[in-house]
A protein has these predicted regions:
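Conserved metal-phosphate-binding beta-hairpin within the catalytic cores
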Residues: 288, 332-372
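Peripheral (often C-terminal) accessory segments that flank ATP-dependent C-N-forming ligase machineries
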Residues: 26, 50, 381-496
Length: 496
């Protein structure tokens, strides 16, 4: 049976036109929702009810970057609702006035940052430093994208020298980012802490990969084992990432396919890959706030290759506690100069006393899982604790109960309703899949919360679906730039 991606509506031109049409026909519904929110919003208990300062401390200016993404928007809303400080925001924009976060009630001012030009990060770095200086920022909370993490680390060091000791940043320096973000460097670092890691090999050529796979095949025959690997780009490579769950080596009668597959990945010294042992088990991700080497807030949840549904694991579960302890060990090892957002991806093997967790990736930046803290007032205090470490709480903050699952309705409408229905109409789907996905969609709408929408702050939701994404789809059509998938929460389009 053909997969949905091979059907006509998944081709470049039809899918962009269909998504533009979806945005257009849903506009009246969204407009009614916004109208209702504007009327109700000012009286909503979730509005910007500032917490008054009782200690007489001066009002501080807090800059949050990355507010086009759900994670940045979530943090500005927390700070706006539960502190009385001056919250401003900054982000890059494909076109002027298209950033969803620009229109949030949670910020007092928005600055447009220059995008990196042809791989040159200097314009971005200069524009961000200019905002930090001109606004006399006291606290910068960085919500980097994958591409901007190292650059934000460079900015942090420069800003500390320029603005002095009173300036604080929730952002690791570039050395820490490189050590944690680069998959091969991460493996070496975690191993040096005495923690277990999957077998990994840094590869800079196809023959190098083939030699390792050949040796593995021989070992598998001799020991009757079935060790397999996955091949992942160390840097950012959307095309390779879409194929990275391909298990290697292939069967013996598929050796030609293995060679063909490897040659398609453009492995080279300038584009290295990591060949990582495939561990059978469920995947989980974490998000934590670290200040001066101490984990202040932590949450974990089930994960996937592109996570669009978030549900927190129970705080007292063995798995959650193991991942927290792992994160604390890394943070404590880095010491007092280590402040930022720290997120890990794990594979869990076994259960109970036999449970093993294998770190497979680290994101030294904010994770979208921070949305699970949306109702947690103490999270705002955790950020402010960087100004007064003696007043900070000793216990790790977890999401406030009752916890909710989070979804993005734009993603679910397409993946749970439209794609199964169109596949059925094309004779390539099953009616059972349509009904099953429709039930899941209804459960999300009635029991979960949308990651972007806030009744007291509805405009980012409107702009996301009726300005930002339509602009991206039009840009894709005009430039003929194809994409394989999109992440609504991070506003990222993956090239194909």
């Amino acid at each position: 049976m053909d997969s949905p991606r091979s059907l006509f509506f998944a081709r470049h031109v039809p899918k962009n036109i269909l998504l533009l049409f979806l945005s257009l026909i849903s506009l009246p519904i969204t407009a009614l929702l916004i109208f209702y929110s504007v009327l109700l919003g000012p009286s909503s208990k979730n509005g910007t009810s500032k917490t008054p300062r009782v200690d007489g401390s001066p009002r501080k200016t807090i800059l949050v970057t990355g507010v086009s993404m759900t994670k940045g928007l979530t943090i500005t809303r927390l700070l706006a609702q539960h502190t009385s400080h001056h919250i401003i925001a900054a982000d890059t924009e494909l076109l002027y006035f298209t950033s969803p976060g620009r229109y949030s009630r949670s910020i007092a001012k928005f600055h447009r940052l220059d995008s990196p030009q042809n791989g040159n990060p200097v314009p971005y770095i200069k524009s961000l430093l200019q905002v930090l200086k001109s606004e006399r920022v006291d606290l910068w909370i960085s919500c980097s994208s994958v591409i901007g993490a190292v650059e934000d680390g460079q900015v942090m060091k420069t800003a500390q020298k320029t603005l002095g000791d009173t300036f604080k940043a929730i952002q690791f320096d570039e050395e820490a980012v490189a050590k944690l973000h680069e998959k091969d460097a991460l493996t070496d670092y975690i191993r040096s802490l005495g923690l277990i890691v999957p077998e990994s090999h840094r590869c800079t050529s196809v023959p190098q990969v083939e030699n390792i796979l050949h040796d593995t095949s021989k070992q598998n025959k001799m020991s009757n084992h079935s060790k397999r690997f996955i091949l992942k780009p160390i840097g950012v490579d959307d095309k390779a990432r879409a194929q990275m769950m391909t298990l290697l080596p292939f069967a013996q009668d598929q050796e030609f396919d293995t060679a063909s597959y490897l040659s398609s990945l453009n492995i080279s010294p300038s584009n290295p890959f990591i060949l990582q042992q495939f561990i059978t088990g469920a995947e989980y991700c974490t998000h934590s706030l670290v200040i001066q080497g101490k984990v202040k807030a932590f949450v974990s949840c089930p994960s996937s290759d592109m996570l669009m549904h978030y549900e927190a694991l129970p705080e007292d579960s063995v798995l959650n506690q193991r991942m927290l302890e792992f994160t604390q060990k890394v943070a404590e090892n880095e010491g007092e100069g280590f402040s930022g957002h720290l997120s890990f991806d794990f594979i869990a093997e076994g259960e109970g006393t036999g449970l093993k967790i294998y770190p497979i990736e680290c994101n030294p930046r904010a994770h979208t899982a921070v949305v699970l803290f949306r109702e947690t007032e103490k999270m705002a205090d955790a950020y402010l604790s960087c100004f007064d470490l003696s007043a900070s709480t000793q216990s790790v903050i977890i999401p406030k109960k009752p916890t909710y699952g989070f979804y993005w309705i734009g993603h679910d409408v397409v993946t749970l309703l439209l794609v199964p229905l169109l596949a059925l109409l094309c004779g390539k789907g099953k009616f059972e899949d349509v009904t099953k996905n429709a039930k899941t969609f209804w459960h999300h709408v009635t029991r979960w919360k949308d990651g972007t929408f806030g009744i007291w702050d509805p405009w980012p939701f409107f702009v996301l679906y009726h300005v930002y994404w339509p602009v991206r789809f039009c840009d894709s059509l005009v430039k003929g730039q194809s994409w394989s998938r999109i992440n609504v929460s991070t506003t990222k389009m993956f090239e194909s």
